[in-house]
Amino acid sequence: DKVIKLPKPNLNRTGTVMKALSERHSTREFASKALNLSDLSDLLWAANGINRSDSGKRTAPSALNKQDVDVYVVLPEGSYLYDAKNHQLNLIAEGDYRGAVAGGQAFVISAPVSLVLVSDLSRFGDTKNAHTQLMGAMDAGIVSQNISIFCSAARLATVPRASMAVSYTHLR
């Protein structure tokens, strides 16, 4: 599908932040079964979804409110860009690119989904400025932490990673 409409996030999931933090850990073993659409919806909303519809502000703060972090969702059938405004996935490329984003880490290839966080530094203006790059890295780190906390609470396996095959950056 070129567009996958996600169900509304379940804002009444059980669990506490403190419990999620106490149980948060990285894992490198993943179930091969697909993540159900409800869990994927909740995960993406928790990562960087809109939690204040009147202002369009997100679950993850961003430097200067530039909302620079885009979340790409890599599934066996294709790669998608998460559209937080419409809470949907927009197809970027058909096919299985999980190996491309594995960055040489074989354990990632079989994960049912990979999330790729990209800070679009052009939203800040000067992309070569070291401070701009630091803000983008910080913003991506905040989204990554949201993902880790949600996965801990939802009992989903996750591991933050910082590598992928550079030759596939054209997918953007």
Per-range role (PLM):
Residues 1-111:
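N-terminal amphipathic, basic helical "cap/leader" segment at the start of enzyme domains
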Residues 49-51, 121-124:
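Solvent-exposed loop/turn segments at secondary-structure junctions
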Residues 112-115, 121-122:
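Histidine/lysine/aspartate-rich catalytic loop segments that bind and position anionic ligands
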Residues 130-139:
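Short pre-catalytic strand/loop immediately N-terminal to key active-site residues, enriched for Gly-Thr
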Residues 152-164:
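Glycine-rich phosphate/pyrophosphate-binding loops
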Residues 169-170:
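Conserved small/polar residues in nucleotide/adenosyl-binding loops
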